[in-house]
Structures are given as structure tokens and as C-alpha cells.
Amino acid sequence: SGLLKMRRLGIISDLPRLFGVQSEHADPVWRYYSKPKAERVYNPVTVRPSVAQAAMIGNPVSFPRVKALVDAYEVAGGEFGVVRVTEQAIMDATILANRHGHIVCTQGGECLAGLLKAREEGRVAAGEKAVLDSTAHALKFAGFQNMYFTDTFPPEYGVAPDASLANRPSLVVDAAEKARLSAEEFTRAAAKAVAERLELAGK
């Protein structure tokens, strides 16, 4: 909607290619757009547990509006597609983004997973610029990140942690030691412990 308005106002001249992203556990929009136009019939789905809980909707009431906007976008010359990703890909992408300082929630991870899948499918070239929609903070769904680090996902999610991405939380200074130290001593002890963990001591 916003891109169509910007084009009408002359702010932009070309419409970028757009992709929606859905999990395999909640994918009614992907199922609709994965078919040729003449064969498309919208059907709701029964959702399965998803880490992207805000998008875990099997029968979105907004679908008629989505379809109307997509139709208008394509008539105006824009391209639209939908990518489907696994729960594993969503969590791996969430952790990957967070490891690089882009603090995202699982819906943001779903968005990045979609970009990676689109590249894998050849729908986005390696040198192309992409803008991802990620508007929530990691703290909103921090429990899923902790499950990833501690390998405690229930089996219905289908998520197994990638050891290379795992960053399990650990105490820097235990509670008993903290209680014994003054504020200044605690600060020094914590800083020293962090430096040692990061192998920065003595550098």
C-alpha cells in the first residue's frame, strides 16, 4: 500500500520486488500463491506450533485485503511472491541476525530466512540489495532463543540447534561471589571474567 502511494506521489518511479514469508507450520498465503493464477483457490490451514507466533495464523482475516493489494501491485508493474521456510530456518536465521548485532524477534528471523530461501531458489541474486521488515525486539520472544541455546525445543517444532550458532548463557560471577564483593570489586571481577571468556585478557 505504501509503495503504491509513493509511486502515485512521484516519490519513487519503480516498484521493488516484494516477497511474503510464511512458515511451513502456517502457510495459507504461500499455498495460494504457489499455484498458477487460474488454479488459485484460497483455503485456510490448521496451524502447527511455530516460533513465529505472531504469524501463526491459519485463516488470516486480512487475506482479502492482501489479495487486493497484490493485484493492484502487479497491475502497476510490481512483482510479488511468497516464500515458505522451515521452523529450523527461522530459528537459525534469528540467531544469525542476533550474532551480528541485528537484534530481531522470531518474526524478524522468519523474514531473514525468507530472504535466504529466495536467494537459494534463485529469486534474489547475491548482489541485490534487500530490505527486511523487522519491527519487534528479541526480548519479546526470548524464550525461543533460550530453547535453542539449551536444546530444549519440544519435538513438534522440528528445531535442532546448530552448534556453531549456539551461545548458551553462562554466569560471569556467581551469586555467592557477588554477595562477598564490594561494588567496585564486582565490576572488576566481572570485567576480568568477560575479557577471559572473549580471550582478550592481556591484550
Question: Where would I find each of the regions flagged by the language model?
Answer:
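Active-site/ligand-binding loops adjacent to catalytic centers
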Residues: K5-V104, Y148-G202
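Claisen-condensing/thiolase-fold acyl-transfer catalytic domains that form or cleave C-C bonds
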Residues: S1, E87-F144
